[in-house]
Amino acid sequence: MQEAPAALPTEPGPSPVPAFLGKLWALVGDPGTDHLIRWSPSGTSFLVSDQSRFAKEVLPQYFKHSNMASFVRQLNMYGFRKVVSIEQGGLLRPERDHVEFQHPSFVRGREQLLERVRRKVPALRGDDGRWRPEDLGRLLGEVQALRGVQESTEARLRELRQQNEILWREVVTLRQSHGQQHRVIGKLIQCLFGPLQAGPSNAGGKRKLSLMLDEGSSCPTPAKFNTCPLPGALLQDPYFIQSPLPETNLGLSPHRARGPIISDIPEDSPSPEGTRLSPSSDGRREKGLALLKEEPASPGGDGEAGLALAPNECDFCVTAPPPLPVAVVQAILEGKGSFSPEGPRNAQQPEPGDPREIPDRGPLGLESGDRSPESLLPPMLLQPPQESVEPAGPLDVLGPSLQGREWTLMDLDMELSLMQPLVPERGEPELAVKGLNSPSPGKDPTLGAPLLLDVQAALGGPALGLPGALTIYSTPESRTASYLGPEASPSP
């Protein structure tokens, strides 16, 4: 008996074709729809002639919809691509509204190739692409670390913002404090240096140098005055003399008879105790006050007296020498002698328009012209003492040019306690100090220009005018000092 041949392994049956591809194959091969959809001449693609009519007339017969866009999307899902011809690729729209699609496995007459047409499936993640737990944990740790760094950075940023605001507020405060300190320093500088820049015309808080002449080897103590009111009648004349109290005893101390002493006195120093001046009716006597004063004996028993020059706007305070008998003074006042009380003034000075007007003087009250001392004072007052004194240490303020000069003072034996010339206003009558400059040719070289004082005496009787009461003598020309002032220069 013959054995049957072994059965060959059967090939697997054809895979089922998707319904969309079967319907599309039938639709394209149907001759009744060639006017709307057909094969291309090459047979590798198919054409859709009129898309709108195709969507309305053909699609509902094979599909459940009549949407051309859905039909095109399904073709793309199976791998069909739209063929763009040269006509359709231009900018101008072609006359025929048709579209062509093609697929390598969709060919006319080869239906078996439809099995190769597969629907595009989204790519699935393989095992290698999945997250492993350890990787996920590491990633979460890194995210948490980044979040912590971010939080710390934000906290630091907030702190920096707060510090920045605080610093700006401090800067504003410091600017305000700096401006206030700058203004205060400016005011202080103005108060300190303003009077110096303003010049001598401003007498307001400016400390002016004052010169005081006193006899002795050291600077004298402040002048002591007897408490005695001045009569109102005596203040009517620019210069007057008031008798001292009976108990006043003055004398020169032996150790203070060396010569005059010049010391610095502040302008705003308080007035001597006990001195009272009645104010002038015209209010102008408050400027410039020259005092001819006396110093009583010191508690130790040594009497001190001297000439004190304290200029206030070119005015001077003069301390009188020890007293002499009253008879000599009365003889002078009664006119006993070879002079007239008004003679020297009328002979040497031009007649002023005002009773108090005095000829023009220098910046410190010195007259510019020379006058003969013989014509200004009576002979009894023109007897200089034989002794001479040298200026003490305080003369150093006058400059080195005045050191070593000698001065002689006339001994006036007059009992008087206070001689005060009142100058009503600056620029009006002032105390004329004929300077301690060298005499002009033809005059006595041992005799300096006199210090003229208009004196009104009050010796128990009516007040009498006295044109001259004091003369300061200087040594010969080679040893004569110029006027006591920092601006003066020694006479040639």
UniProtKB/Swiss-Prot annotation:
**PTM note:** Phosphorylated mainly on serine residues. Phosphorylation on Ser-298 promotes sumoylation on Lys-293. Isoform HSF4B is constitutively sumoylated. Sumoylation represses the transcriptional activity and is promoted by phosphorylation on Ser-298. HSFA is not sumoylated.
* Chain residue ranges for the region called Interactions with DUSP26, MAPK1 and MAPK2: 245-322
Q: Does the keyword Phosphoprotein apply?
A: yes
Locate the region Hydrophobic repeat HR-A/B.
Answer: 129-203
Q: Note down the stretches annotated as region Disordered.
A: 246-285, 337-400
Pfam families listed in its UniProt record: HSF_DNA-bind (PF00447)
What GO biological process, any one, is recorded here? negative regulation of transcription by RNA polymerase II
Q: Where is this region: Hydrophobic repeat HR-C?
A: 364-389
Which InterPro entries does the entry mention? HSF_DNA-bd, WH-like_DNA-bd_sf, WH_DNA-bd_sf
- Which residue windows are coiled coil? none
Which cystines does this chain contain?
none
Give Gene Ontology CC terms.
Answer: chromatin; nuclear speck
Gene Ontology molecular function, alphabetical? DNA-binding transcription factor activity, RNA polymerase II-specific; identical protein binding; protein phosphatase binding; RNA polymerase II cis-regulatory region sequence-specific DNA binding; sequence-specific double-stranded DNA binding
Name the UniProt key words of this record, in alphabetical order: Activator, Cataract, Disease variant, DNA-binding, Isopeptide bond, Nucleus, Phosphoprotein, Repressor, Stress response, Transcription, Transcription regulation, Ubl conjugation
Superkingdom: Eukaryota
Which regions of the protein are recorded as binding DNA?
17-121
Low complexity bias locations:
374-388
**Cross-link (Glycyl lysine isopeptide (Lys-Gly) (interchain with G-Cter in SUMO)) at which positions?**
293
Residues with the modification Phosphoserine, per the entry, are 298
Fetch the Gene3D superfamilies from UniProt. Answer: Winged helix-like DNA-binding domain superfamily/Winged helix DNA-binding domain (1.10.10.10)
Mainly resides where?
A: nucleus
Disease with which this protein is associated in UniProt: Cataract 5, multiple types: An opacification of the crystalline lens of the eye that frequently results in visual impairment or blindness. Opacities vary in morphology, are often confined to a portion of the lens, and may be static or progressive. CTRCT5 includes infantile, lamellar, zonular, nuclear, anterior polar, stellate, and Marner-type cataracts, among others. Finger malformation is observed in some kindreds.
Biological role:
Heat-shock transcription factor that specifically binds heat shock promoter elements (HSE). Required for denucleation and organelle rupture and degradation that occur during eye lens terminal differentiation, when fiber cells that compose the lens degrade all membrane-bound organelles in order to provide lens with transparency to allow the passage of light. In this process, may regulate denucleation of lens fiber cells in part by activating DNASE2B transcription. May be involved in DNA repair through the transcriptional regulation of RAD51.
Q: Subunit composition? A: Homotrimer. Exhibits constitutive DNA binding and forms trimers even in the absence of stress. Interacts with ALKBH4, DUSP26, MAPK1, MAPK2, MAPK8 and MAP kinase p38.
> What family is reported?
Belongs to the HSF family.
State what protein this is by name.
Answer: Heat shock factor protein 4
**In which organism is this protein found?**
Homo sapiens (Human)
Name the lineage: Eukaryota, Metazoa, Chordata, Craniata, Vertebrata
